[in-house]
């Protein structure tokens, strides 16, 4: 009986002492939006022309894996802020929008990327209201962490 009890307790000890190795690292870092490169566009205070295309170019990075990126262009005729702009560009007078430009667009990031450069053509309609606009960039990593960068731009 003692041998059985000893064998049972020894087996129980080894079974409970074996811990499943969980080397999975939990991602707690926000992804990064980089618009400082020479060819990045738009940048703070960039001017965009009505009726013309421009190329959105930025670099995104994450410590584990990027998920998605989206752009939101909307008017700033009321001088609101998203608290991400580093400086203002000198506002036009406050005005009521008649036909403002609004664009909300997702851009794909291939799976498994830690660094990605986006290059996307955006057409600005010719008949929109000129003035102050915000160009918001949102990048989300696979874990769900999101970084937002707001740029003040002018549409002429």
Give the role of each language-model region.
Residues 28-156:
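First exposed extracellular module after export/assembly in secreted or surface-exposed proteins
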Residues 11-39:
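Bacterial Sec-dependent N-terminal signal peptides
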Residues 2-9:
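Sec-dependent signal peptide recognition
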Residues 10-11, 149:
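Short, linear, compositionally biased motifs with a strong N-terminal bias
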Residues 2, 18-19, 137:
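Short, intrinsically disordered low-complexity segments
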């Amino acid at each position: 009986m003692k041998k059985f009890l000893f064998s049972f307790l020894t087996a129980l000890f080894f079974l409970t002492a074996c811990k499943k190795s969980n080397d999975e690292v939990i991602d707690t870092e926000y992804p990064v939006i980089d618009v400082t490169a020479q060819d990045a566009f738009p940048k703070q205070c960039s001017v965009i022309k009505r009726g013309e295309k421009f190329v959105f170019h930025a670099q995104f990075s994450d410590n584990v894996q990027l998920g998605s990126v989206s752009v939101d262009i909307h008017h700033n005729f009321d001088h609101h802020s998203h608290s991400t702009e580093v400086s203002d560009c000198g506002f036009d007078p406050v005005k009521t929008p008649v036909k403002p430009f609004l664009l909300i667009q997702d851009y794909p990031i291939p799976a498994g990327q830690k660094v990605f450069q986006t290059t996307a053509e955006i057409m600005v309609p010719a008949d929109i209201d000129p003035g102050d606009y915000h160009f918001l960039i949102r990048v989300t990593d696979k874990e769900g962490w999101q970084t937002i960068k707001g740029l003040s731009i002018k549409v002429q």
